[in-house]
Amino acid sequence: MRYALGVEYDGSEFQGWQQLGEHGGPSVQASLQAALSSVADAPVQVVCAGRTDAGVHGECQVVHFDSDARREPRGWMLGTTARLPPSIAVRWCVPAADDFHARFSARARRYRYRLLNRQIRPALYRQTLSWERRPLDADAMHAAAQALLGENDFSAFRSVQCQALHARRHLQAIHVQRIGEVVEVQVQANAFLHHMVRNIVGSLILVGTGEQPADWIATLLAGRDRTVAGPTAPPQGLVFIGPLYPAEWHLPAEVTQ
C-alpha cells in the first residue's frame, strides 16, 4: 500500500535531504527511511517532492512510500516520529493512490527565504535566518523580482553543479516584504533549479542595497550568465514550504492547490 507523509525538519545538522552513500554524512532521507523501516519491520524507501541542500529546512516536505505492513496512518505518524531525531517530525500521514508520486504529481513548489536586516548578526535564530547588515529596500527588491515571472530560461540563477536537462522553469509568484527587521522572499514555481532560489535572493540583495538598479534582474535573466549575477545566499535562511498537488489526490489542504 502507498502512503504520503508530510515531514518537517531543521536542516542544520544534515548534509541535505538526499542520502549520499555510506560516507556522505547524515541526511534527512536516511533518518526517515531508518525510522519507517523500524515501524514496518522491513526496509522502506521514500521518494520526496523536492530535494533540499545542506542547511536548508523543510516545513512540509511531502514523501511517498510503499509498505505491506498493516499500520494505521496515525501509527505510521506517531511511531515514525518517535524514532526520529528531534530535528525531524512527521506532521501527517494519509493513504495515497497507487499512482501518486510525491515528485511527479506535484503541480508547484514553494520556498521562503528570510534574512535578518540589522547591524548585529543573529544569535537566537542563527540557524534559521540569514543576515545582511546593510540596509535593504524590500520594495525595490520586490519590484525588481517581478521581471522573473513567467516561463523563462533561468541559467543566470542555476548552480554549476545543476544536473537539470534544461534551465526553463515557470516562476508563478515571487513576493518580497519587510516584517520588522526581517526581509522575506517567497517564491512559487512549477520546479526549481539547483540553488535557484538562493541565487535569486543573492542578486536581489544587491538591488536592495542600491548597488544595482532594479532593471538589473531583468538584464541578468536575459543574459543567462551565472558569472555576472549576485552571490549565492547562505542556506540557513531557506525553507522549503512544500509542494502543491491537484485536489484529485485528496491530500491535506496545506499541500493542495
Swiss-Prot record:
Keywords: Isomerase, tRNA processing. One of its GO terms (molecular function) is RNA binding. It catalyses: uridine(38/39/40) in tRNA = pseudouridine(38/39/40) in tRNA. The active site is at D53. Pfam families: PseudoU_synth_1. One of its GO terms (biological process) is tRNA pseudouridine synthesis. Its EC number is 5.4.99.12. Gene3D superfamilies: Pseudouridine synthase I, catalytic domain, C-terminal subdomain (3.30.70.660), Pseudouridine synthase I, catalytic domain, N-terminal subdomain (3.30.70.580). Transmembrane segments: none annotated. Formation of pseudouridine at positions 38, 39 and 40 in the anticodon stem and loop of transfer RNAs. HAMAP family: TruA. NCBIfam families: hisT_truA. Homodimer. PANTHER family: PSEUDOURIDYLATE SYNTHASE, TRNA PSEUDOURIDINE SYNTHASE-LIKE 1. Belongs to the tRNA pseudouridine synthase TruA family. This is tRNA pseudouridine synthase A. It comes from Xanthomonas euvesicatoria pv. vesicatoria (strain 85-10). The gene is truA.
